[in-house]
C-alpha cells in the first residue's frame, strides 16, 4: 500500500483534535491489522449528495487479541500490541485511537504513552478496572473497579510525559458495566477531569441506551460546574439502536465502532471454510470471495508490477540505444 497523503507522526497526533474541532465529532472504525486498516481508511459511501468516510481508526484490545487467537484478558502484551499498531500506521494516514486496557501501573502507562505518541497515535483510552481486566461485553465476567483516586494518579502520570498537548489521554468509565450506576460514573468522571483527562468514555453492555443518555445529560452539568469539558466518547456496540447522529445530538464527540471488522471477518472465514468442505472444492466459495486482483490492488501490488514494467521498458530502450551501430563522421581527404 502506497499512502496517497502521507503524514509525519507529529502531524498525525494532531489530526484527531483537528477533526473534532472542525465538525464537532469524529467517527472511527476498528482495525486489527494492516489490511483492515487500509479498508477503514479508504471506504467511502455517497449519501444524500455527501461523501461519507471514517475519520480515524480504533486499535482494539479485543480484536487485536482475537486476531492472534488469544482472549481479551490482559494476555497479549504491550510489545505485541505496539507491533500491530505500527503495522496499521505504516499503511494508513488517518488518526488512530488505541485501546490501552487498564494502562497497567503508572510507570507502565508512562512508557506506553511515550511510545504511542512517538509512533503518531492521537489518543489512548484506559479503563478504570483492576488489572488483569476482563472484557466488558461478557456479562458473566467479574468486573472489579480500580480506586478512582489511584486511577486519577495514572491519568496524571500519562499526561505528564506527553510531548505535546495534542496527544490525548482518555478515561473509560466502567461503572455501568460493573453495576455501580450513573452516580458512581459521574463521581469518577469528576475525579478524572480534575486529574487532567482529555476525554471521558462512558461504557455500557446493555442494549437499552437510557443510562448512557442519562449520563450524557448529567455530564453537561458536571462540566459546566467544573469549568472544563473533555470530549465525550461512545462505543455503541450493544446500544446501536442509537444512530451516530443521535449520539452527536446528545453531546458525544467521538464515536467508536469498536469490533465490527474482526467480527465480520470471523463470520466470513468460518462460512467459507465450511463451504469448501461441503462443496468438495473451492469453486463453491468463489462467489463469496474477493478476486485476488482486488486484494492486489488494495495492498499496492499492482503499483509494484507497474513499476517493474516501466523499469523493464526503460532498460529495453537503453539497451537498444547501446546496441545501435556507432555513427562515424566522414573524414576529410
Describe the function of each predicted region:
Residues 2-256, 311-330:
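Alpha/beta enzyme core
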Residues 2-10, 16, 35, 260-333:
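Extended, intrinsically disordered, low-complexity segments
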